[in-house]
């Protein structure tokens, strides 16, 4: 990798002159600029973004903090962020918060130290983590899992929850286990409330359960006690786990219990039976959030909350009447 000294030697100028030309913080004659540019191209020199940011008090770095990079949904989100950022001349510094406040705070501190111009984040584990995000005083856009009052790019979760409920009703659901995640987040609350409303209006029995506390033994108890014939999951990864448990319990999907997921991650077509699920535009969520953030950084427009449509993908894990 070429160094700034090699660029200076190639262009026959001082290192200080190369630095001024790159950072734009001093006068450099056009003829000299042309020589430096030719040297940069010839040597394929890549300026250090962090070093430049320290000189310019501004960077082309964006911090990206996601809650679970093992979930393919967030992998797609990250790809959308990265592709849009690179197309606009920015770089990404990524952190996997893993719903761990200590990790989240460490990544936020790293974004600050490295002079990130803005931050894109999804679910944070605690109110204190959100406070520290806002304390950076950098423009930020949240993806999918917002708290009240934050600028967010998310899918239409009211529509998503409605589609989940309508789909299992089409399969003649009579007793439903409705799984949910942290309802303090608007996205989880919206899809939960929407599904529950549709089911209750259809006079269907509904049992609710915090997803993270569900075990195979508890699932078996619910099925025996409430004659559960349909399960709504808040994401595809949980839906796969539920279907594995049902297989272990010798319960047929969808004949005895139908299962519907949320996200439509790539593995949804690889499982047997293939998973009926709500498709979230994960890649587009990442792109939209990045575009909004960069537009704000460049003074084009202030970010506004955006809602993207979802759709239902019917596969083999639900019944069709």
Give short role names for the model-derived ranges.
Residues 1-60, 76, 319:
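N-terminal helix-turn-helix DNA-binding module of bacterial transcription factors
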Residues 7-8, 40, 184, 257, ...:
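Append "Primarily bacterial transcriptional regulators
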Residues 35, 73-87, 160-163, 186-204, ...:
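Short, solvent-exposed amphipathic alpha-helices that sit
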Residues 99, 121-163, 237, 263-275:
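Flexible loop/hinge segments that line or gate small-molecule binding clefts
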